[in-house]
Amino acid sequence: MPRYPFRRFGFGALRRLLYLWVRSETINQSAFTLKIDRSKPVLYVLQQPSVSDLAVVDTECRKAGLPRPVMPVAVGDAIEPAAFFYLTPEPDWLGRQDKRGASPTLVRMLAAVGQNGLDDAQIIPVSVFWGQSPDSESSPWKLLFADNWAVTGRLRKLARILILGRKTRVQFSAPIHLRELVEQGKGHERTLRMVNRILRVHFRNLKTAVIGPDLSHRRNLVKGLLRAPLVRQAINEECESERISQEKAEGIALRYANEIASDFSYPVIRFLEVILSWFWNKLYEGVKVNHIERVQDVAQGNEIVYVPCHRSHIDYLLLSYLLFRNGLTPPHIAAGINLNMPVIGSILRRGGAFFMRRSFKGNQLYTAVFNEYLHTLFSRGFSTEYFVEGGRSRTGRMLHPRTGMLAITLRSFLRDSRRPIVFVPVYIGYERVLEGRTYLGELRGATKKKESIFDLFKVVGALKQRFGQVWVNFGEPIHLDQFLDRHQPDWQDQDLGPEYRPDWLPQTTNLLAKDVARHLNDAAAINPVNLVALALLSTSRQALDESALARILDLYLALLRKVPYSPSATLPDGDGQALIEYVKSMNLLAEQKDALGRILYLDEQNAVLATYYRNNVLHVFALPALIASFFQSNSRISREQLLRFARALYPYLQAELFIRWSLDELDAVIDQWLAALVEQGLLRQENDTFIRPAPSSRQYVLLILLARSVTQTLQRFYMAIALLLNAGQNALTAEELENLCTVMAQRLSILHGLNAPEFFDKSLFRHFIQTLLDLRVLRKDEAGKLSYHELLGELAEGAAKRVLPAEIRLSIRQVALERPAEEAAAESNDAAAN
């Protein structure tokens, strides 16, 4: 080892020879962000003796300007010949190695701090990864080359360097201060054992986070599923219900298991990384990643479940690519069975995808096998990924979460909670979504088509377009044990039954789903396209003078900087004019020049598509827009009135858009927004009353444009309420009301020239009706007919009256009154049938 000058000379020659081939980098710039005190001794610790690992660490230290491990270091009055040691001591001349022994260097350092008065010493754990790959016994190539959990021999190490040396990554971890451990007063021997134990656990957890847990043979894993008690029970029940033999039922279960299970392959991961690196650089202008340190903080020692929003088929690939590039194990990804097609399915499966059917209903054996497979992933520490929205959002909104996968995760955790589960929300924001043209027809009201990976190939002709950037924000993690402690404090002491399906599971799963959706929206990446779409769609003809558009964008940026939506949300750089130039460069804006300047507008195709990008961030602006709405029909309003009516409307906005603030927090947040609007000149305050600007002023126009962001949402609320009140008590079922609302919205969109198909989106009415039921404003009788509380009338004539202009309310009431309920319901049912 290079502890003395002659050896250091030989080591330097070896390092230069090694780097004729090897290329290395630090994971997440960890060498450049170390917080060390250079006035105190710094030593590096590596897990196993390895000259090649040491050479890589020495090179990365030179790059980062850190103290080099092969150089002497002063320890009080003594000099250590080198500033590194191995956790597992080096073998002696006969090749014998005491794996339980302690490094002599560590013993001396601890003695210097504990007994000889040295102020402190800093120990920096360093890990070198020659490629990243979970081990799989079925692949001799992986066993020979990839970093894994097996003991590494010299021949294998050489092969690994030759095969994987150009993809070498180094992780520098935070320093361990020996002074802090010595001050615990446990004595030299116990402190030494404690330091060794801390380092062993650290290296094990880091290795799990970076290369994944030790994978067993896939064939053994699949067969192991069939031996699980719950699967055995399902097999026996299948035999009885279908009157088939045990062997045949086991064959069916085995077929299900093989259909489901992923087959992680390091060569495929590396292949995809190369392809995707080219793809992002070719198609997009880079990927901006924010808050990934949150994942790195929780990856060690926890089971990570990534829950991204779902906007595009490339979401699957993007997240795995980013995690791999940042030194984290790509997750096992839940994918729809429709993607398990020849060639594509095999690549996805080897890239970590496991496949699931859209519905498990009526197939208890499949359900048992799938649940057991997920439980195996969770209990063994494999990170996983699934989309709580179910499918891709065609409207740009956060879809209402599907609770199936969350319920399976919850039940698995109740079954075995030894390994904590942490949900990591991931917001993926595109400035131009790849499937935009596919979504365009659906936004115009065409029937939703079945999802297929081949949708991606339909956009090949559009690859000459500029797609801008992709933004990936990691949200605030949700610790499942802490979530259960809040909502079911005695969950660990309850008798959960043989299937781990307590009575409170459905309600708790729904609460978890809403939490995940809100955390996803909290991490919104607000980009230039979102803001321009929001501004132009708030005008009557989707057009604005360029200088006016720049002022609106500057206003939006100023408001969001004054009252940030959440610590996880991000804003674009630049001012309003810079944002306009950027969006123009993407050919999303049309322009017309005249003597007074330039008018920017959205053509018909881009106007419909712009609703998608506006909807990405509608939840961010919903509350200030609601506040602004109170001044469309009122020149002034007291704070007390505004708060009262806002409290009445907010629960419905929150339920539809998954807005982050609770009702208890609402008053304080509204006060912040009122102060921001006053600061920007959009409101004026006199004592406890807020006054809008003069209608002829520029500030008034800005205020009204802000209010229009949520006008269509409030109109839909008012429509449903007006139809209910007009029909009377116990006259309509929820389904009849939903259909009636859809027909009415379609008619209003024709009458008022609204080019926004989502205005009559049936699912939005369905969820609004469900929210009214959840809040007990509506009730169902035995026949399913709806009765309403007197609060409904107050909502219509109190709150709605103050946020919707009189002409809009009149138009809605006229349409509701002109059509007898029975006739409209019949027509709506005909429309539904067609």
Swiss-Prot record:
UniProt keyword annotations, A-Z: Acyltransferase, Cell inner membrane, Cell membrane, Lipid biosynthesis, Lipid metabolism, Membrane, Phospholipid biosynthesis, Phospholipid metabolism, Transferase
Keyword presence, Transferase: yes
Biological process according to GO: CDP-diacylglycerol biosynthetic process; fatty acid metabolic process
Matches recorded under Pfam families: Acyltransferase, GPAT_C
GO MF annotation terms: glycerol-3-phosphate O-acyltransferase activity
Top-level EC class as recorded in UniProt: transferase
Matches recorded under SMART domains: PlsC (SM00563)
EC number(s) stated in the UniProt entry for this protein: 2.3.1.15
Family annotation (SUPFAM superfamilies): Glycerol-3-phosphate (1)-acyltransferase
A Gene Ontology term for the protein's cellular component: plasma membrane
InterPro entries reported in the protein's UniProt record: GPAT/DHAPAT, GPAT/DHAPAT_C, GPAT/DHAPAT_LPLAT, GPAT_PlsB, Plipid/glycerol_acylTrfase
Family in the record: Belongs to the GPAT/DAPAT family.
The protein's name: Glycerol-3-phosphate acyltransferase
Organism field: Pseudomonas aeruginosa (strain UCBPP-PA14)
Lineage: Bacteria, Pseudomonadati, Pseudomonadota, Gammaproteobacteria, Pseudomonadales
